[in-house]
Amino acid sequence: MSGFSPELIDYLEGKISFEEFERRREERKTREKKSLQEKGKLSAEENPDDSEVPSSSGINSTKSQDKDVNEGETSDGVRKSVHKVFASMLGENEDDEEEEEEEEEEEEEEETPEQPTAGDVFVLEMVLNRETKKMMKEKRPRSKLPRALRGLMGEANIRFARGEREEAILMCMEIIRQAPLAYEPFSTLAMIYEDQGDMEKSLQFELIAAHLNPSDTEEWVRLAEMSLEQDNIKQAIFCYTKALKYEPTNVRYLWERSSLYEQMGDHKMAMDGYRRILNLLSPSDGERFMQLARDMAKSYYEANDVTSAINIIDEAFSKHQGLVSMEDVNIAAELYISNKQYDKALEIITDFSGIVLEKKTSEEGTSEENKAPENVTCTIPDGVPIDITVKLMVCLVHLNILEPLNPLLTTLVEQNPEDMGDLYLDVAEAFLDVGEYNSALPLLSALVCSERYNLAVVWLRHAECLKALGYMERAAESYGKVVDLAPLHLDARISLSTLQQQLGQPEKALEALEPMYDPDTLAQDANAAQQELKLLLHRSTLLFSQGKMYGYVDTLLTMLAMLLKVAMNRAQVCLISSSKSGERHLYLIKVSRDKISDSNDQESANCDAKAIFAVLTSVLTKDDWWNLLLKAIYSLCDLSRFQEAELLVDSSLEYYSFYDDRQKRKELEYFGLSAAILDKNFRKAYNYIRIMVMENVNKPQLWNIFNQVTMHSQDVRHHRFCLRLMLKNPENHALCVLNGHNAFVSGSFKHALGQYVQAFRTHPDEPLYSFCIGLTFIHMASQKYVLRRHALIVQGFSFLNRYLSLRGPCQESFYNLGRGLHQLGLIHLAIHYYQKALELPPLVVEGIELDQLDLRRDIAYNLSLIYQSSGNTGMAQTLLYTYCSI
């Protein structure tokens, strides 16, 4: 097999189809041809002398040799001039292209044509007799099998005839190896395998033989039939295509191939084939033309290609007007009506069905200012089908020609709606389209009262008609009937809900918008998810307008869970239904990793989620989904469901469309921080604020939030974080103060004092830093083992007095000074400042409640402790009853 081409080996081994084999072979031949051309160019460049014209002596010697050697005889001993005469008499060309090229070269070299002699004529008569016998037989293609291998080919056929199949196969393989372009060995191999019963292998070799001898159309057709026996429609189409290459006008081949294309579902190719058949049919084949055009128009119409269907039917009507039947008129009118070309449909009906429309003008008022009114009359001959009459009515309605409709309507309503319900509906829909609701209502009422046409689509039209006429209650009943018959009809549900809301029935309005699909269906069916999303949008709007916030949040979470399904799995968040609040509602909870579906289920869920995501984003844009998410977060916080707001933010941050948008990601992080603080989840809040202050070191608002979070977290991990950040940003004022606070809380008073002094130097007029320095000195003086305690106390109170002067006399400043004295045991001085603070009102700060800044309870409690320790319990109780009782 080493001499075989790789594509042939792959085809024989069944690795590729025959179409692939032919494609690879053509590509290989093209590559080989290009490589030969490139080699020829290279050799011409390397040996430029070879491309020059040879000397005349060489030419003359060649000519003399050609004349001497039998005067240009062919291999069978006959001069080429005889062949020329023979060919000119028969009007045929040589089959062998190589011999034709040689003849052309001979003719170019010979200066004068050779005239036939008497001997040539004698030989010509012999050749004519021989060729006449050949022409009596079937014309066979010229073989590409070399003479040296013809004997071996004959031997292989003899071996096959004797039953020695293996030897015959080996001989054929050897011939293929030496002459891969000869079709005879492949044909013999096909017969051998067919004799063995291996029809698949036989077909393979037959296809190769046909490929090497492609002009035999009957062989291609036979191979197509064999392919169909093996249910290989694609290969059969390929064979018919090959046959049509050599017989492009064969109608049978075109018909068979188009039928196969229809079986394959390739509507376009099938219709192209049928169109070619139409072009090939003669004018005498009118019936066949009309039938084929009729079938093509129906097929185009079913494929929603109305324009092509109209073109086909127009061509049929123009070429064979005398063969147009009532069925053709009905089809043409249907096509034009579906394309809203009512004038064309009316023209077809009046031209080919015998129906006559006449305009009669009254004689009154002949002036141009007072144009005479026109009365249109309609005459319908007997035998016109009711279908065409109804299409005439539809056209008249849309063209606003209403005069002849009354007798036509009378004729229609005389028909039984059980039998002619579809015609009733066509006319009713035409009236609805032009706004003639009063005319449409009787027809629709007759249909909904029938048994056969008591359908959802009819009830829907009936409801729309009643709604347009203002009969809201009856319209609501009809919409309810639609929902009963078709529970998944979204538009009917929405219309029913809107009507019931207008009629003052909010509970029924909500009931109409109950979910249509279960969660499993929504997770797998993209169209179901799309319908459910539209319904939930209307339901959420209705719930919000009714003030039902828990139900409103349920719909928002349901919609967001459809979008964030994969993201929620990554965030380990699950949406559950629970009745913990007394009513059943949806809640977001955190679940463990082992409760999340395994990887295989996750992959399939991801694939489904991609398809569903494409549908969901077609209903709502990215910004609409973002607004929906914000509404859900705000609503959860309004209901004090802060933990669920956190989980929703976590899931949204796992959603790539939101996370990739930097602005939205930052906004989500702020939402997460706020929800965590409101939920008192300060550990999680610290994770948010830590990143924020790293990115915005010089933002005081973030440092204020950071201080609040760390103050409530009861955690000291932020100490090292602040120190590391201080090394990177040594000039940051907020970090300086925070590090002072951290050191003060940790008992490192000297470190705290250094940080406070640094802050004091940059902002000496800030009362806080004077207060912090004074308080630090007092704490240092309060330690058990300390040197120069008196100096520390003096320095501490000097800074506290500075704080008092900067802050001014107020409840806060006197209270803080009293606390310092109280800590040092200077009770009499502490009582003085406590009493002064107790006499002053609390500070008024915009945005903060007055009670939040009132220190009288704290002052009274400290005073009560002093009085109690001194034995004055009555005074202590009086203070507690006055300021600390609830």
UniProtKB/Swiss-Prot annotation:
Compositionally biased intervals (Acidic residues): 92-113
UniProt GO cellular component terms: fibrillar center; nuclear membrane; nucleoplasm; transcription factor TFIIIC complex
Start and stop residues of the TPR repeats: 149-182, 183-216, 217-250, 252-284, 290-323, 326-361, 421-454, 456-489, 491-523, 733-766, 811-844
GO biological process: 5S class rRNA transcription by RNA polymerase III; transcription by RNA polymerase III; tRNA transcription by RNA polymerase III
PROSITE patterns: TPR, TPR_REGION
Phosphoserine modification, residue list: S43, S282
Subunit note: Part of the TFIIIC subcomplex TFIIIC2, consisting of six subunits, GTF3C1, GTF3C2, GTF3C3, GTF3C4, GTF3C5 and GTF3C6. Interacts with BRF1 and TBP.
Name of the protein this chain belongs to: General transcription factor 3C polypeptide 3
Annotated organism of origin: Homo sapiens
Gene from which this protein is expressed: GTF3C3
